[in-house]
């Protein structure tokens, strides 16, 4: 689960992190009062969407010359004008795709005198089985580009879970970021509290880009991104309350209600599979034959007919889907249950695209019999390779 920047900063502020004063608004009419409540005279007006690259993004409804989704304002009047121009419009960034995201809220923040921009994130480094700091002196820009072009400028410091962030760890991080004086002193409290927040809130990612050194020498969190482990949200009512479903794919929200592992993708072949490994293999073979999967959908090992039907309806709700491949290996999951669920869903929503079903495992013959006797236009496949060829051929006509 992701949250907005202003929410992430409020959470970090609660742990004692240095963040600027700011106010979130939902209406342009609130911009003037928000700006007046801040020290000024510089302000930053930030679009709040769950996507990076906001500053370089462009609004669909505005001219190409218009400013992006993060704007500097030098007066309260500028804040108001920018708020009127940004709220309600669609921001397209490198991470949103061509569709973009509608800006439904803004964060009006006090400006900062920036001396240096740094990068700092925490994530789970699975290669060593520890939470690690990933830091770079090249902050305020696309960290993926830095990793590709100048990987030597990125350093990783793994933290021993038994000790937490030690003075030696802080020294390593500070050296990597070339922190001195007041910034180095701030680091002694900042990095341990970031680690504590990451662990206590069950985050999967905490990214600060940029972490700045101000002209007075002190550190400040200028931007913050947080992702949380969805499987741990039951422990965090406060975090769950921050969820903004308008920023999420409607199909993924519906899938979560059925405990389906569903991720929307950009292709045109819908996939319904049981087991994450088989789902990955199914997507791979679709790509091998020249097409792209429209989704990752794992119905799990113990799904009933209703859950299968729900998964099928979610897949068919995607207008990009031009064909559907159902690939089931029945172990705990029974093939006849899959067949009944697919048929129930097809009868309810209709079938306007080709459907190929490959079944193998428990009750496979019964499952095939149910499909064959359904009278529906369902193409049977003998194995995964055969299934992929048939769905691609059906789409190509």
Curated annotation (Swiss-Prot):
A Pfam match: Ligase_CoA
Binding-site residues for substrate, renumbered to this chain: 274, 331-333
Co-factor binding details: Binds 1 Mg(2+) ion per subunit.
Stored Gene3D superfamilies: ATP-grasp fold, A domain, ATP-grasp fold, B domain, Succinyl-CoA synthetase domains
Record GO terms (molecular function): ATP binding; magnesium ion binding; succinate-CoA ligase (ADP-forming) activity; succinate-CoA ligase (GDP-forming) activity
InterPro entries: ATP-grasp, ATP-grasp_succ-CoA_synth-type, ATP_grasp_subdomain_1, Succ-CoA_synthase_bsu_CS, SUCC_ACL_C, Succ_CoA_ligase-like_bsu, Succinyl-CoA_synth-like
GO biological process entries: succinyl-CoA metabolic process; tricarboxylic acid cycle
UniProt-annotated binding residues for Mg(2+): 209, 223
Residue intervals of the ATP-grasp domain: 9-254
Keyword Signal appears in the UniProt entry: no
Cofactor: Mg(2+)
Family statement drawn from the similarity comment of this UniProt entry: Belongs to the succinate/malate CoA ligase beta subunit family.
Subunit structure and binding partners: Heterotetramer of two alpha and two beta subunits.
HAMAP family for the chain: Succ_CoA_beta (MF_00558)
Name of this protein: Succinate--CoA ligase [ADP-forming] subunit beta
